[in-house]
Amino acid sequence: MAPNIRKSHPLLKIINNSLIDLPSPSNISAWWNFGSLLGICLITQILTGLLLAMHYTADTSLAFSSVAHTCRNVQYGWLIRNLHANGASFFFICIYLHIGRGFYYGSYLYKETWNTGVILLLTLMATAFVGYVLPWGQMSFWGATVITNLFSAIPYIGQTLVEWAWGGFSVDNPTLTRFFALHFLLPFLIAGITIIHLTFLHESGSNNPLGIVSHCDKIPFHPYFSLKDILGFTLMFIPLLILAFFSPNLLGDPENFTPANPLVTPPHIKPEWYFLFAYAILRSIPNKLGGVLALAASVLILFLIPFLHKSKQRSMTFRPLSQMLFWLLVANLLILTWIGSQPVEHPFIIIGQTASFTYFLILLILFPTIGALENKMLY
């Protein structure tokens, strides 16, 4: 029999083992689609970003005009820009759902895969932040000023660190230039870490909704899940295209239609919707350093999740108490997202503080406690 090139060629063999003959659990649900959706998001963002970079000028006097020029005068420039801006939102929707899936079904017990995933989330957040600054609108400028200024809360080296990051004494031309360089570089770093993420995943194989070992019942990735993924791509691209064509500025901030002006502060400085939960946690503490620590902890807490798993069952499928707690956490995050978009006044302050406290309470104390309690009830 002639050797199959797909299985013998050094490069094709890697692709074959990752995307074609990959043994996959037979019972994984649509929640397992989000990994491939994130891959498609990354490819789309890199391609649209590359096309935008060809028309963008990283200079404070030209950045805003160059974006306007791209939308007005470049063939389909408006579409590329709208896909890129809204593609970021879909990227975050997918990654949050992907993390939620991992949390619900106990996928975090594959520690290396989980930790590289958290590093990917942090890199994605950094990429989105520096990218938001590039159009050099009012919210771009003031968002950059407020968030980079947080580093000044670090004792002793803070102020030096901020001035070093700015390349001067305020957010100005050097800042914009380096942010553009970083925004160009980081997606390729994300692509590299993604390969590491997949390497670790393929060491152990995928988890499944039952949270049990599935070695006895595997099926090839192609055609079963490759087809299922194509359906996922379609279901994601349809809303993305609707958003890009019909209401491209729905998720943006109206302040960004005004060119950056260091002399005029917008009434409410707030980041894009996907950072609002963390922004609410930052604002809930009336001390600068405390707020920065809480902000960092709100994301870095994900590294602790594998160590807080006290249940004898991996998945939450058969753990109703943990399920209730999980959906309480989801509701809590939605409340934080809403609070982050509101002005700092009564009653939003106290709601934000309560929701921030509850967020850490659920993750650090209630989840391990309920896990141990369920063990007592079940075994």
UniProtKB/Swiss-Prot annotation:
UniProt binding sites for heme b b562: H84, H183
Positions with a binding annotation for heme b b566: H98, H197
Cofactor: heme b
UniProt membrane topology term: Multi-pass membrane protein
InterPro entries tied to this protein: Cyt_b/b6_C, Cyt_b/b6_C_sf, Cyt_b/b6_N, Cytb/b6-like_sf, Cytochrome_b, Cytochrome_b_C_euk/bac, Cytochrome_b_N_euk/bac, Di-haem_cyt_TM
Principal localisation: mitochondrion
Assembly information from the UniProt record: The cytochrome bc1 complex contains 11 subunits: 3 respiratory subunits (MT-CYB, CYC1 and UQCRFS1), 2 core proteins (UQCRC1 and UQCRC2) and 6 low-molecular weight proteins (UQCRH/QCR6, UQCRB/QCR7, UQCRQ/QCR8, UQCR10/QCR9, UQCR11/QCR10 and a cleavage product of UQCRFS1). This cytochrome bc1 complex then forms a dimer.
Miscellaneous comment as given in the Swiss-Prot or TrEMBL entry: Heme 1 (or BL or b562) is low-potential and absorbs at about 562 nm, and heme 2 (or BH or b566) is high-potential and absorbs at about 566 nm.
Name this protein carries in UniProt: Cytochrome b
